[in-house]
From Swiss-Prot:
The keyword Ubl conjugation applies. A motif (Nuclear export signal 2) lies at residues 268-276. It comes from Nipah virus. This is Matrix protein. The lineage of its organism: Viruses, Riboviria, Orthornavirae, Negarnaviricota, Haploviricotina. Its main location: virion.
Length: 352
């Protein structure tokens, strides 16, 4: 069955239209890894492989690695035999590399490294990772492992306030997530294009609902109920704009037909934690295709879109419950957007 979207009636320039569940029938579910404990009470490290997309190039050996671990104190008191104090959980993204090594070899070598964790600040709170140790199977990721890396804390750390400044902290890895990049390419639309606004344009957004195997309310997420009565969480992303010349708008029904012809296919991966992969199997307009970098395989990382929801998916199974196309007027240029807002003592809002 070909993916399609149900028709929408639109007398305005806005509309919401659901995609058929067949468009995420293959690859719309990520299973969680069941923890195992050894005789000493420590978690046994595991790995899992994800293959989102159509797997057009099954043997190219390109893969994205992200590992998860406990942030714990380095010091240990030998005379008391106390276990190291666990402070929080963090994700350590390693990025893309090409390797023919067995996943177990990658995992064991990662676990043998000494990975340090430090809390600092710039425009936002940051987490700095450093690592040391011999590299063999992990040579394709040598740059990030030997040079260190820095991330916005909210994206990679569950409770950054628990990371101590007066003690050395280390990451004890317990899970390695491997996303095989087996399609003809993986492409993330540049932020400048995602923020592109234009008058007389219709913005093409996606509203994605996720069913997560967790108590959303305990995580501070209100959520909503799907048609089966399950609580789901949602996020929205921007794909591009339908632009018409001569100062006119396309109708929403016209845009819907354009989207229908694109025959979009959705799947989940583990780029940056959780990622939505979109494959364009049909026909796409030249202008919209240009906005997507002339790529038919797109990837959106939830780490960048909604880091709070992304952290919830780290150790829980997750599946797509619903995907809808949302058509809205593009925000006009005259609408002022402030990345930084300051308020003076008179209450006036000033541009930063």
């Amino acid at each position: 069955m070909e993916p399609d979207i149900k028709s929408i009636s639109s007398e305005s320039m806005e509309g919401v239209s659901d995609f058929s569940p067949s468009s995420w029938e293959h690859g719309g579910y990520l299973d969680k890894v069941e923890p195992e404990i050894d005789e000493n009470g420590s978690m046994i490290p595991k790995y899992k492989i994800y293959t989102p997309g159509a797997n057009e190039r099954k043997y190219n050996n390109y893969m994205y690695l992200i590992c998860y671990g406990f942030v714990e104190d380095v010091e240990r008191t030998p005379e008391t035999g106390k276990r190291k104090k666990i402070r929080t959980i963090a994700a350590y993204p390693l990025g893309v590399g090409k390797s023919a090594s067995h996943p177990q070899d990658l995992l064991e070598e990662l676990c043998s490294l000494k990975v340090t964790v430090r809390r600092t600040a710039g425009s936002t709170e940051k987490i700095v990772f450093g690592s040391s140790g011999p590299l063999n199977h992990l040579v394709p990721w040598k740059k990030v492992l030997t040079s260190g890396s820095i991330f916005n804390a909210v994206k990679v750390c569950r409770n950054v306030d628990q990371i101590q400044l007066d003690k050395h902290q280390a990451l004890r890895i317990f899970f390695l997530s491997i996303t095989k990049l087996n399609d003809s390419g993986i492409y993330m639309i540049p932020r400048t294009m995602l923020e592109f606004r234009r008058n007389n344009a219709i913005a093409f957004n996606l509203l994605v609902y996720l069913k997560i195997d967790a108590d959303l309310s305990k995580m501070g997420i209100q959520g909503s109920l799907d048609k089966d009565g399950f609580k789901v969480a949602s996020f929205m992303l921007h794909l591009g704009n339908f632009v018409r010349r001569a100062g006119k708008y396309y109708s929403v029904d016209y845009c819907r037909r354009k989207i229908d012809r694109m025959k979009l296919q959705f799947s989940l991966g583990s780029i940056g934690g959780l990622s939505l992969h979109i494959k364009i199997n049909g026909v796409i307009s030249k202008r919209l295709f240009a906005q997507m970098g002339f790529q038919k395989n797109l990837c959106f990382s939830l780490m960048d879109i909604n880091p709070w929801l992304n952290r919830l998916t780290w150790n829980n199974s997750c599946e797509i419950s619903r995907v809808a196309a949302v058509l809205q007027p593009s925000i006009p240029r005259e609408f002022m957007i402030y990345d930084d807002v300051f308020i003076d003592n008179t209450g006036r809002i000033l541009k930063g």
